[in-house]
Amino acid sequence: MSKAVVVYFSGYGHTKRVAQAAAEGAQASLVEIDSEGNIPEAAWDLLDQAQSILFGAPTYMGSVPWQFKKFADATSRKWFVRQWQDKVFGGFTNSASLNGDKQVSLILMHTLASQHGGIWVSLGLAPANTSASSRADINNLGASVGALVQSPSDADAQAIPSGDLETVKLYAARVARIGQQLHA
């Protein structure tokens, strides 16, 4: 059984890099939502067997893109039979701006997990909020609900700040660890 799964949509490659960091931190399987908002049929079984699931999506125009929302709506067949009841969930999002209304995307993911009767894991990392803080610091965007990432709009995925990627790794490891503890 795969203990942790990262399911994500990436429009321009930035979220894919973040999802890979999350998978590394959680030692998780990766499931990519395609450009039509679908996942492979076998991926549904992988999600069903997981102890913990991390959602990932960019924030476009103040929320998740339609491809992630289509996936979220497709989970209703799991909701109907309470397939994901008591699973552990977390989520991450990125946008080009430091704020970019990313919190809305995390709240959507949190709500989706709650609809399924899941247990949402907070970030659990103190913010880097002193005058000496930099973008290389852990949780330099000051998140608490989940992981936030800023991806420069004029650069490729390699330009994502190291502090953001490390924050995602640590958070994903926390989600997976709590999933293992609750389902031991």
UniProtKB/Swiss-Prot annotation:
Q: Which gene encodes it?
A: fldP
Q: Which organism is it from?
A: Pseudomonas aeruginosa (strain UCBPP-PA14)
- What is known about its induction? Up-regulated by oxidative stress conditions through an OxyR-independent mechanism. Makes part of an operon that consists of PA14_22510 to PA14_22540. Is repressed by the LysR-like transcriptional regulator PA14_22550.
Is Electron transport among the key words of this record? yes
> Would you tell me the Gene Ontology cellular component terms?
membrane
Record keywords, A-Z = Electron transport, Flavoprotein, FMN, Stress response, Transport
Q: Which Pfam families match?
A: FMN_red (PF03358)
MF terms in GO: FMN binding; NAD(P)H dehydrogenase (quinone) activity
The answer to keyword ATP-binding applying to this record is: no
Please give the function described in this protein's UniProt entry: Flavodoxins are low-potential electron donors to a number of redox enzymes. FldP protects the cell from oxidative stress and reactive oxygen species (ROS) damage, thereby expanding the capabilities of P.aeruginosa to thrive in hostile environments, and contributes to bacterial survival within the host. In vitro, is able to mediate ferredoxin-NADP(H) reductase (FNR)-driven cytochrome c reduction.
Cofactor dependence: FMN
Q: Which residues bind FMN?
A: 10-14, 91-147
The family assignment reads:
Belongs to the FldP flavodoxin family.
**Phenotype upon loss of function:** Cells lacking this gene accumulate higher intracellular ROS levels and exhibit decreased tolerance to H(2)O(2) toxicity compared to wild-type siblings. Inactivation of this gene also produces a moderate but significant decrease of 24% in the intracellular survival of P.aeruginosa in phagocytic cells. During in vivo infection of Drosophila melanogaster, flies that have been fed with the wild-type strain of P.aeruginosa die faster than those fed with the fldP deletion mutant.
Among PANTHER family, the record links this protein to:
FLAVODOXIN-RELATED PROTEIN WRBA-RELATED (PTHR30546), FLAVOPROTEIN-LIKE PROTEIN YCP4-RELATED (PTHR30546:SF23)
Give start and end of each Flavodoxin-like domain: 4-176
Entry's PROSITE patterns? Answer: FLAVODOXIN_LIKE
Q: What is this protein called?
A: Flavodoxin FldP
